[in-house]
Amino acid sequence: MNEEQLLKRKIIDTDNQAFNHNIYTYTNFLSINELSSVNKMSNELSFIPYDEWGGNPVCERKIIRFGSEELYGYDAGYPISTIRISPLSVKFAEQLNHRDYLGAIMNLGIERELVGDIIIKVPDAYVYCLSHIADYICDNLDSIKHTHIRCTICTDEIEAIKPELEEIRIIAASKRIDAVVASLTRLSRSNSNELFTSKKIFLNGICTENKSQNLKKDDVLVIRGHGKYIFIGDEAETRKGRSYLTLMQYK
């Protein structure tokens, strides 16, 4: 059984638990590619609704929750905690990167699927994780490389990592997704096409290699390594027949 088949089995089992026991059920954190695979499985799942959440709207790694308030009469939320990691002495702290933080956490014996996105806002970092391991991380993680740190579970919304939406306008050859991607990334059409073949383009949660489809209002476009956008629409044409397009970009 390959990894994709194993993932499908886990998803179907989690879906069936929600269906058979009338309770919310959750996956562990899934990568953006795994989430894409799940979003293609609608014909293999029960009628139980599901949604995704990673801690904030721009997270790539998310858990899936089966069930809804409409179905069960209550909202169980998501078992995700946010941990702030801060150096004990900012003056003597090293410049730590994503790999440093993730490596230190996994060295505690924690599996990757229990940890979501890590957002670095120097001098701090914020780690999304499943709630049942948050205390363990805080109790056991006291240094990263040569930097002594403290961990705190955040109970309120953190303004420092709250995403903002900014309206942007671009000029593209058309509303075709390849034209929009080329304009957003400032790459040539041929170079931007490599993003499709390397499976870095996601439209409404599904990895796509179809370069010819037109974007529609409220489509959510993710370009890995470049950003996340909501397509608003086209406004007018230039004298040369190119399109003015409006999108909202997560900052």
Residue ranges and their predicted role:
Residues 1-184, 207, 228-251:
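Ferredoxin-like alpha/beta domains used as RNA- or RNAP-binding modules
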Residues 219-220, 229:
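Short histidine
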